[in-house]
């Protein structure tokens, strides 16, 4: 938010389900960062997102997004485990890529430092799917 204030522009940050988001009018740009589009695992839902974005964009507006590819999920992350121990906490990140469905599941266990000095353990399962570049363009 500090960067927004420094920019001098009125930037509206929203957190909504991208399959159902609503705006108060049209905008010049929509930005979806950090591979958010990979959370959309169904082609119909991705089409819904694209239609919503198109609906809220100015005629010359731009939609900026990034997506991880099948190559990244299969070859780089694959069925691997990544673990790190940092000053503020630790994590264990287990990946499982299903070749048949194209679904990648992150089993993420976080150990976060509490003010008491104890560590708090949380666990999240994150499901993501790469979308074929040609399919995405055709939608």
PLM region descriptions:
Residues 1-4:
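Conserved SAM-binding loop
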Residues 28-45:
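A short SAM/SAH-binding and catalytic strip from SAM-dependent methyltransferases
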Residues 64-135:
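SAM-dependent methyltransferase
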Residues 22, 32-33, 47, 69:
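Residues lining hydrophobic/aromatic ligand-binding pockets adjacent to catalytic sites
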Residues 6-23:
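Conserved SAM-binding strand-loop segment of SAM-dependent methyltransferases
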Residues 47-62:
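A short glycine-rich, Lys/Arg-flanked "PGG" loop and its adjoining helix->strand segment in the class I
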Residues 15, 33, 64:
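Generic enzyme active-site microenvironment
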Residues 22, 38-40, 71-75:
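Short catalytic/ligand-binding loop motif for oxyanion handling, primarily in non-cytosolic enzymes
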């Amino acid at each position: 938010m500090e960067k927004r204030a420094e920019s001098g522009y009125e930037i509206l940050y929203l957190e909504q389900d991208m399959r159902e988001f609503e705006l108060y009018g049209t905008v010049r740009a929509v930005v979806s960062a950090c591979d958010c589009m990979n959370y959309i695992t169904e082609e119909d839902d991705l089409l819904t997102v694209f239609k919503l974005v198109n609906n809220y964009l100015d005629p010359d507006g731009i939609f900026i997004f990034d997506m991880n590819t099948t190559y990244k999920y299969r070859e780089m992350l694959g069925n691997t485990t990544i673990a790190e121990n940092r000053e503020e906490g630790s994590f264990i990140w287990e990946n499982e890529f299903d070749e048949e469905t194209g679904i990648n599941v992150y089993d993420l266990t976080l150990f976060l430092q509490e003010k008491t000095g104890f560590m708090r353990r949380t666990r999240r399962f994150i499901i993501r799917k790469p979308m074929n570049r040609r399919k995405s363009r055709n939608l």
